[in-house]
């Protein structure tokens, strides 16, 4: 299991942040239906592998497909909240 900085800061006796999304995750995997959520702090569990989530990034929802490498991480790590800066070159030079 890979530990994020958020998971390391959390006490061991508290356990992972497990969230009930209000739907059956296994049915969403079979039906290929994305689960829409704003809970970025939810820990990804092994039963979520193969599911698609739409994670809120503050403005819109980012599509995230869960793979085995993501187990133990948080949903919010895969939905960036900030835009990457791109320097625009001018043609006058």
Curated annotation (Swiss-Prot):
Assigned keywords, A-Z: Mitochondrion, Ribonucleoprotein, Ribosomal protein
UniProt GO cellular component terms: mitochondrial small ribosomal subunit; mitochondrion
The keyword Ribonucleoprotein belongs to this UniProt entry's keyword annotation: yes
Gene Ontology terms describing biological process: mitochondrial translation; ribosomal small subunit assembly
A Pfam family per the record: Ribosomal_S19
Location of the protein in the cell: Mitochondrion
Transmembrane segments: none
A GO molecular-function annotation: RNA binding
Predominant place of localization: mitochondrion
Database matches in PROSITE patterns: RIBOSOMAL_S19
This protein's record includes keyword Signal: no
Role this protein plays: Component of the mitochondrial ribosome (mitoribosome), a dedicated translation machinery responsible for the synthesis of mitochondrial genome-encoded proteins, including at least some of the essential transmembrane subunits of the mitochondrial respiratory chain. The mitoribosomes are attached to the mitochondrial inner membrane and translation products are cotranslationally integrated into the membrane.
Self-association and partners: Component of the mitochondrial small ribosomal subunit (mt-SSU). Mature yeast 74S mitochondrial ribosomes consist of a small (37S) and a large (54S) subunit. The 37S small subunit contains a 15S ribosomal RNA (15S mt-rRNA) and at least 32 different proteins. The 54S large subunit contains a 21S rRNA (21S mt-rRNA) and at least 45 different proteins.
Annotated family: Belongs to the universal ribosomal protein uS19 family.
Protein name: Small ribosomal subunit protein uS19m
Species whose genome carries this gene: Schizosaccharomyces pombe (strain 972 / ATCC 24843) (Fission yeast)
């Amino acid at each position: 299991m890979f530990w994020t900085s958020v998971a390391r800061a959390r006490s061991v006796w508290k356990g992972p942040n497990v969230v009930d999304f209000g739907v059956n995750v296994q049915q969403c995997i079979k039906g290929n239906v994305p689960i829409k959520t704003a809970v970025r702090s939810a820990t990804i569990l092994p039963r979520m592998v193969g599911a698609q989530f739409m994670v809120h990034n503050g403005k819109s929802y980012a599509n995230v497909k869960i793979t085995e490498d993501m187990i133990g991480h948080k949903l919010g790590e895969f939905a960036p909240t900030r835009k990457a800066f791109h320097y625009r070159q001018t043609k006058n030079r």
